[in-house]
Amino acid sequence: MSLTLRVLAPDQSVFDGSADEVILPSTTGQVGILPGHVSLLAALDVGVLRVRTNSNWQSIALMGGFAEVESDDVTVLVNSAELGVNIDSTSAESDLSAARTAVTKLEGQPSTPEKVKAQQLFQRARARAQASKST
């Protein structure tokens, strides 16, 4: 018994296949999905979705969205996503370092659009870096 997983972004189908286990980055924490899971609708945070097929794990960097689990079908609708194997880890680490520097520079300051954008860029860079290493 396995799950059917679909990860869909507005411009592409990122993943469409079978999985034995899926770990979702929900806004309330990690949610593990196995065959027979109860129906679920969850908001997703920027983070890494992990997919296990047999003993192999794949990672997908997600930039927020929603997941629906219904009768062993998992549908993930996201703003954008990237397979970990398609992310250059050196470039992702460089982007993460630059984003971390930008956030650190703005620490202690009141919330401004610039600070919010820097924090969002940091979250995205961290998700991409984690997904690039998890493959």
From Swiss-Prot:
Function: Produces ATP from ADP in the presence of a proton gradient across the membrane.
Compartment list: Cellular thylakoid membrane
Keyword check for Metal-binding: no
Subunit details: F-type ATPases have 2 components, CF(1) - the catalytic core - and CF(0) - the membrane proton channel. CF(1) has five subunits: alpha(3), beta(3), gamma(1), delta(1), epsilon(1). CF(0) has three main subunits: a, b and c.
Name the UniProt record assigns to this protein: ATP synthase epsilon chain
Keywords carried by this UniProt record: ATP synthesis, CF(1), Hydrogen ion transport, Ion transport, Membrane, Thylakoid, Transport
HAMAP family, per database record: ATP_synth_epsil_bac
Annotated gene: atpC
A GO MF label: proton-transporting ATP synthase activity, rotational mechanism
Family: Belongs to the ATPase epsilon chain family.
Pfam family, one: ATP-synt_DE_N
Membrane topology: Peripheral membrane protein
SUPFAM superfamilies, sorted: Epsilon subunit of F1F0-ATP synthase N-terminal domain
An example Gene Ontology CC term for this record: plasma membrane-derived thylakoid membrane
Region (Disordered): 101-122
PANTHER family reported for this sequence: ATP SYNTHASE DELTA/EPSILON CHAIN (PTHR13822), ATP SYNTHASE EPSILON CHAIN, CHLOROPLASTIC (PTHR13822:SF10)
Phylogenetic placement of the source organism: Bacteria, Bacillati, Cyanobacteriota, Cyanophyceae, Synechococcales
Location, primary (coarse class): membrane
CDD domains noted in UniProt: F1-ATPase_delta
Entries under NCBIfam families matching the protein: ATP_synt_epsi
Transmembrane feature ranges: none
